Amino acid sequence: MNSRSCICVSAMKPCCRFLISFRSSSLFGFSPPNSGKFINSSKLHCTKIDSRSIRSGIHCRRIVLDRNAFCDSDSISWGGGGSRVLRARGSSRGRGRGVLVIPHVASDFRNYSTSSLDSHVNDKSFESMFVKPLVFKEVEKTEGIPKRERGNVGGGKDANFGNVGVRKETERCLSQTEVEKEAWKLLRGAVVNYCGFPVGTVAANDPGDTQTLNYDQVFIRDFVPSAYAFMLDGEGEIVRNFLLHTLQLQSWEKTVDCHSPGPGLMPASFKVKSAPLEGNDGSFEEFLDPDFGGSAIGRVSPVDSGLWWIILLRAYGKLTGDYTLQERIDVQTGIKLILKLCLADGFDMFPTLLVTDGSCMVDRRMGIHGHPLEIQALFYSALRCAREMLIVNDGTKSLVTAVNNRLSALSFHIREYYWVDIKKINEIYRYNTEEYSADATNKFNIYPEQIPTWLVDWIPDKGGYFIGNLQPAHMDFRFFTLGNLWAVISSLGNQEQNEGVMTLIEEKWDDLVANMPLKICFPALEKDEWRIITGSDPKNTPWSYHNGGSWPTLLWQFTLACIKMGKLELAKKAVAVAEKRLKEDEWPEYYDTKSGRFVGKQSRLYQTWTIAGFLAAKKLIEQPEKASLLFWEEDYQLLETCVCGLSKSSGRKNKCSRFTPPRS
């Protein structure tokens, strides 16, 4: 039997400093040999690295005469230590893009040397991280050793789920509808492999699409519903791989027009590419090509990517029981870098994040620049996730304190100033303006004339919602679904406000759900508003795309919010509406018209997060007990640091919208 060789090159590309003890580290899942058979240990030492002078990434090189290969696991000896080396052999199936030569892409930093870490444990600068730059090259040929195929997403056999058993495929299929069966087939067909291991799902996988644009990439926000669907189905490997690979991409040098953003920025997307190796016929290497917004329409920075990454990291631990991932030094450092970027001091007087238009799911010009609700809700959720996962020590105490302070201030700000119901709108209608005082009622100098005519008749007597944006002399009264749902899921709103959001959706079902759940925002910008605010965007015409279009991917978030608020039947109703049409309409990205009757005029078909959103919603309905792992209840400890609690006025705290005592 002819054996083929594999070459793997792993070159870390950090933006800060990393430290790993060589003697006890288990980088890539094995202990390095004492002998110099494969590695020159003299070159493996701790060093400070300037990110501006390094441009390297994780590459997986394979030498294969044909490109049909799948992963084999062979046990060989590395200087006396056991290890697995995956070699190219045989043929691949599905969307396999490569052969993984090293079982785990990122290192297991938890097996570090205590002595090596002691000198850095008291480092007060939480942005500091330490890494040992490594380049591993291995060429080995072995035969007759038992092999095991890896990288399959479907059976869940390789998922790291502890004592949680994986359901048999036959039992699972018996309980699935035809729509679900097709959805699972499509979702698994959208999986992208890197070096033989699944690392994500493409944005869309329409076989009839001749112009893929960037829909053949793995987007962080798009992959989140796919990750939830896989984990709820007992498959965690793809999520773990995704989290680790995107973490490595975080450290890449990011430059657009000679300017580099902060090192904590996560990419909007990445793509697996391959390039031929010089001097080797038939051999090539795979590499990840990230996009940090430099190729996006409008060149917008993906602010929400890092927030989604932290949220997904927590969900991975909750659903799989594998908390070792979030405890790793490299992962802990990734969390800190994102937090540093979000908590950086600036000119803003508010605890909300100031962003440009198009920096989240609404990624085109839609008048959401400033402090959009979607970003604030995800920011709050990410802060709560990070606070749970951060390992508290002398080096992180100041960061944890900053997180707690921001959580308290942010929840107060959103609950107090973003919330509207019939009572609040009537209050705004009677506002005095031009108030110059620290105790002013109309703190943002909102003119009553800003209340739109549609809102006066639309707002129900019961219920309410969080407005889309707030800035001086400006309130965006549009209802943005994703932001309101995450306000409920994360308990950014208090109990009454969360109930009010769900009541409003139920009351305004014909506007927000109708023929296809759910409206991304309501109402649409029309006529002069559309021309001025969107710049006459031909894709965001009224009741289309982000301007009032209906997006089925929001189903899973709606289902999670419904389960939290005890409205499971409402979620089932919405899923049933979608299930009637999605398969027939070929899983479109979005729907047009006020009631969501038409498939979007520029909608991609077989959109992965449409498929995954539907499947995740179905799984949550089947397993509502798991939903409790994914949402948050009110944190009453935050109320102790409320600014109202610091007031000398004893009665002021009772009036604070953040304070809603727990129900008996």
Curated annotation (Swiss-Prot):
**Phenotype when inactivated?**
Delayed germination time, reduced plant growth, delayed flowering and reduced oxygen consumption in the dark.
Establish whether keyword S-adenosyl-L-methionine is in the entry: no
A biological process (GO) of this protein is: regulation of seed germination
Q: Which reaction does it catalyse?
A: Hydrolysis of terminal non-reducing beta-D-fructofuranoside residues in beta-D-fructofuranosides
- Secreted recorded as keyword: no
Q: What does this protein do?
A: Mitochondrial invertase that cleaves sucrose into glucose and fructose and is involved in the regulation of aerial tissue development and floral transition. May be modulating hormone balance in relation to the radicle emergence.
Could you say which tissues express the protein in this record? Expressed in seedlings, roots and flowers.
Q: What is its EC number?
A: 3.2.1.26
Any idea which residues bear Phosphoserine here?
41, 125, 657
Q: Which family does it belong to?
A: Belongs to the glycosyl hydrolase 100 family.
Any Pfam family matching the protein: Glyco_hydro_100
Entry keyword set: Carbohydrate metabolism, Glycosidase, Hydrolase, Mitochondrion, Phosphoprotein, Transit peptide
> How is this protein's function tied to pH?
Optimum pH is 6.0.
Question: Where is the protein found, in the record's own terms?
Answer: Mitochondrion
Underlying gene: INVC
| Official protein name in the record | Alkaline/neutral invertase C, mitochondrial
Which molecular-function annotation in GO is an example for this chain?
Answer: sucrose alpha-glucosidase activity
This protein's GO CC annotations: mitochondrion
